[in-house]
Structures are given as structure tokens and as C-alpha cells.
From Swiss-Prot:
InterPro entries: aa-tRNA-synth_I_CS, Arg-tRNA-ligase, Arg-tRNA-synth_N, Arg-tRNA-synth_N_sf, ArgRS_core, DALR_anticod-bd, Rossmann-like_a/b/a_fold, tRNAsynth_Ia_anticodon-bd. Keywords: Aminoacyl-tRNA synthetase, ATP-binding, Cytoplasm, Ligase, Nucleotide-binding, Protein biosynthesis. The gene is argS. It holds the Pfam family DALR_1. Belongs to the class-I aminoacyl-tRNA synthetase family. Its EC number is 6.1.1.19. PROSITE patterns: AA_TRNA_LIGASE_I. GO terms for cellular component: cytoplasm. It comes from the Bacteria. This is Arginine--tRNA ligase. It catalyses: tRNA(Arg) + L-arginine + ATP = L-arginyl-tRNA(Arg) + AMP + diphosphate. Monomer. GO terms for biological process: arginyl-tRNA aminoacylation.
Amino acid sequence: MRAKNHLQTALKAVVADLELPWPDKVSIEPPKDKKFGDLAANIALVLAKPAAMPPRELAARITERLQQKYPEISGVEIAGPGFINVTYAPDFWHRTVHMVEQAGGRFGSVNVGNGRKVQIEYVSANPTGPLHIGHGRGAAIGDSLARMMRFAGFETSTEYYINDAGRQMLLLGASVYYRAKQIKGLDVAEPEEYYRGDYIRDIASEVLGFTPDLLEKPEEEALAVCQKYAVDTIMAGIRQDLADFSVSHDVWFSEKSLVETGAVDKTFDRLRRSGLAYEEDGALWFRTTDFGDDKNRVLKKSNGYLTYFASDIAYHDNKYDRGFDLCVDIWGADHHGYVPRMRAAVQALGKPADSFDVILVQLVNLLRNGEQVAMSTRAGEFETLADVVKEVGADAARFMFLSRKSDSSLDFDLELVKQRSMDNPVYYVQYAHARICSVLRKAAERGTTPETHSDEELLKPLVHADEIDMLRLVDRFEDTVEAAATSLSVHHISYYLQELASALHRFYANHPVLNAPDEQILKARLALLRAVAQVLRNGLDLLGVSAPEAM
């Protein structure tokens, strides 16, 4: 926020003039009530003791100097025990329009990352069936987080971890094999555990099509054929579903490759050498209790099978070997108990605890006609992501997934999302952009187009409280991006966009732009609206949502 940075710089200069130290815990934030100004600072409260004077007396000295040295500050008041409330003159806010015009699509970008290498792993659904709506929420969060981190100065790579090894893959192959037997009319007992969806039957039919002698092959060979084709087919569908959802990954990493390249054994050797892995009862254990876990964990079972944890440690070892400074995993909330042991593993690999973070994504409650839609991959009773995107569109689905904190459950109302009304959040924001574009088009048709670069004289008429409110919000976009990037929380962007859209719609209702009292006010307001449209576009792009020019 330019205003926040300006006030901090001004206060530092004043504090230096008073020959006082700059304290650590200075708060400069917009007050809850706008009547108290644009920003409130607690500088006098935290400096009172070093200055050896009452906070209000110190605040008086600070405010006097602020008013003397900074003409862009139009008002300073002391509140309560010594808070300093600052109000900026309109021309200070007018400069925000210039900044948007100069930066364009980069307005709001910050360099908090400073080139640090970040890897974000998301979706990583088992290739045992189509993506469901819960996967869609994780996909939207991961893809948007990657966009935002790049915008915030991080060198960002995205990855999908393909769980193509282990028991689930064996079960998938067996499910297809069972269905193939059914198709051929064999009287076979239904397995106690298998994947039941229609997609399994479709895959079995395709396997029989190119391998008509499947059931004549040795069972082990037939199962291998079924498993490989099923994994390849399902992964192709997953890739397509994500592409249709405007989600991409830079790397698709195979779990199987960890075993085939010896990466798992290499990680085991590293843990043994550091005394963190040990043999007991024929199994290999990891001392996760050394890092705060509630018990030690098995890496390799006594029957020789690897645990998921073993592969995950080797996988993260591989991530750090590729030079990432921060690894972010996006998991379903049902994996919350897995977080402490993975943190332990990262520290055991010799990496800082803060080099690894997990975003937990809560469930999506999909509603249709007021009733919740059941989702179970094995039972085949789930609403696929592809179905939802086809019904409501990628834009609406993405925005809804990003409209709440990731760790909060989300009610996804299919009927609401399809409505072209102000009750629909994505429509509300997109329509704000389309509404501005419509005003700009109509103004151009009448022969009035805002200047490419607005000068101070042109913007002088912008003094109404509604206009200043929008300028404040535009100025705050950079702060929002920084907060979202540092907290790994993309919902900050969707919240901000809804607030900015609300200000725009309110302004539009109260001030019919094309009916402005005179040409000067019209041109100033057109410049303001064009800046707001740019910020809406930038924010929507971070969410992977389009900014239509007409709706």
C-alpha cells in the first residue's frame, strides 16, 4: 500500500528528527471506521517509554512535524491514549491512477519472494478414477497460488505427484480384470473391495478390444495389462479435465520412478547414517519422535512392502535435491494427521522446518436441489469435476472454490453459481469489469475517451467520498497480494475483488458516469474506472478467472 509505505517513511524521518530509536512493533493500519482517517499508527504508544514522556504528548510532537513536513497529509488527529490518525489529501490518492496506468498488468505485483525457488504440489489424486469436485478445489487453490507467487517475485514450479505404485494400483488392475470377466459372461464372485464406477467397465471393454485373449493369459500378466492401461487412461482423463479447468502443471512426477531409480533406498541410507532409521521386528522404522511426532513410523514393513510414508520422504528428498527453497503441498483436510510426520521427515533430511508447508483443503459440500450429492470413488457415486465445469463453467467453479479460506468447508450451490445475479459472487465481480467496459465504450461512442496517461489537472475533480474510497481500495491491492503470498492464502484475493466490485457497483448506482455534470468530471471518472477495471483484471487473472468485457 503506497499510503502505508509513505506514512512509515514519514514517521521514520520524524522519529529520527526527535532523536529516538525506531521501534520493532509499529502498527500502521486503516482504522475500522473511516471517520478516523485513512491510516492509524501506534508509534507514540510504543515509543513513549524510550522517549520518557506520556504517549499523547509524544503524539503531539509527532503530529506537529508531520503537518509541517508533508503537505500531502491533509489531517492528523490524536485519538484515545495516543493513536495518530492520518488523512491524506485527494491529490495523494489521485497518483494511484498514474501508478495503475504505468504498471498495467503488473500493478499490484511485489517482490517479497526475491527470486526464491518455490515448488507447489497439488491435486496429486490417485489415478483410480476421474477427478471429483474436491480435487477441483485443490486444483484451483494450487494453480492460483502458483500464479500469485510468481506475481509476488517467487520462481515457482508446479507439480503433480502420480501415485502409480502400491496397493491402490493393484486394486485398480484387479477391478478392471474383474469387470472384463463379467463382460465375458463369466460367473465370478464379486471382490470384497474394488472400484465400481462405470468408468471401470468402460476401461475393461477397451482392454478386451485390443487384447481379446486377455482372459487366456496368465492372471499375473493379465492384471499387469489391466493396471497399466487403466492408469494411462485415467491419467489422460485427469490431464484433460485439468486443462479444461485452466489448470496446468510444470512437472508430472511418477512415484514408481522413485523405486526404479533407487531413490527410496538412497533416502533410507541417509536416514540410517544419521541414526534416524533402525531395524526392529523385521521392519525398518524412522525416529520421528526426535522431531515432535507422537510415535516412530514404519518405512518398510516386515513383508518387504514400502509404506506410503517411505515414498513420500524419498519424494521430498528429491524435491530438495532439485534446489527448491520452499516446498508447499496442498492436501485434503483428512490428511491433517500426516503433517507432523512429514515435517519431521523434512527436518531429518537436514532442511529448515520453515522450508516446508502444507495447505489443508476442507471438503466441498455439493448441493443439487437442496440435497447433498454423495461422493465415493469406489462406489462410483460422485460428481466429477468435468461434469461440474460443463454445467457451470470453469470461471464460476474456480471463483467459488477460491471464495473461502481453504481450511473452511465450502457449500457449492450449483443453482446459485449458474445465476446471472448479484447474489452470485463470480458474476458480481465479473459484471463489475464488464460494466466499466460498457461505460468506456459508450463514452467513446460519444467522443469522450480517457487520456492514455492522466495528469493531475485531469484528476482534480475526483474529491467525492465514493471516489476516494475506490482509490483507497485500488491502492490496497498490492498489500493484498503481499498478504496472500506471505500467508499462502489465495482467498485474500477473492475477498478483495468482491470488496472492490461492491465499491464499483455502489459508485455506479450513486454517480451515473455518463451523465456527469461536466466534461472534466466525466473524463476524471472515466480515468478512475479504467484504473479499477485494470485492477479487477489483474486480480481475476491471479485466480485464473476471465474478465469479460460484456455480459
